[in-house]
């Protein structure tokens, strides 16, 4: 109706040249697993708060109808894994998610303990398990382009308006993915 793909919609086929590609919007959330090995799940939020960090999601992101955000994240992972597993093996995937799919990409130098609100370790290997060509995300507001195991990981957020150089044209903030 509005021309927007959601994670529940059939995956769109990329109309450009080359191999068959599917545009895969996902909605995977976070489960506090992007934390150091010595920090338990039960202590994760307190660990982050000890450095003066607390995500607004703790107060504003209700997990309903799930009991916790962890449960909601697990349900989204399970549903998405099932859909990805059902795709033909020769279809290349362009995955778009709000959060990075790997813990090593959830690095915020000024607020390192914010990582617990940046994704889930359950997706760390998805770029190898599935036929992923590129992963697009934006939660960190730290634009970057990395290649891991031959897969591009593109942090493409525009950031907040205060982070923009108003003299720079919008086109300078954009980059081709395919």
What are these regions (language model features)?
Residues 4-7, 11-25, 30, 91-92, ...:
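Beta-strand-turn-beta hairpins that frame and shape the catalytic cleft
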Residues 5-15, 57-63, 129-135, 169-175:
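Low-complexity, flexible helical/coil segments
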Residues 11-12, 28-29, 100, 133, ...:
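Catalytic metal-binding/acid-base residues of hydrolase active sites
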Residues 22-94, 101-110:
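Active-site-proximal loop/helix segment associated with metal-binding centers of metalloenzymes
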Residues 23, 98, 139, 153:
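Divalent metal-coordination and catalytic microenvironments
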Residues 107-108, 113-116, 120-133, 140-178:
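Binuclear metal-dependent phosphoesterase catalytic core
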């Amino acid at each position: 109706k509005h021309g927007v793909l959601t994670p529940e919609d059939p995956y769109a086929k990329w109309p450009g040249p080359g191999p068959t590609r599917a545009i895969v919007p996902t909605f995977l959330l976070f489960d506090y697993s992007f934390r150091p090995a010595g920090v338990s799940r039960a202590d994760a939020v307190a660990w982050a708060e000890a450095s003066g960090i607390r995500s607004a999601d703790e107060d504003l992101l209700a997990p309903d109808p799930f009991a916790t955000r962890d449960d909601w994240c697990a349900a989204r992972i399970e549903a998405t894994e099932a859909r990805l597993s059902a795709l033909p093996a020769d279809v290349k995937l362009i995955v778009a998610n709000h959060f990075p799919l790997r813990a090593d990409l959830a690095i915020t130098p000024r607020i390192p303990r914010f990582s617990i609100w940046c994704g889930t370790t359950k997706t760390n290997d998805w770029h190898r398990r599935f036929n992923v060509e590129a992963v697009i995300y934006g939660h960190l507001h730290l634009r970057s382009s990395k290649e891991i195991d031959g897969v591009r990981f593109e942090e493409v957020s525009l950031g907040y308006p205060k982070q923009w150089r108003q003299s720079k044209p919008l086109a300078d903030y954009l980059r081709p993915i395919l």
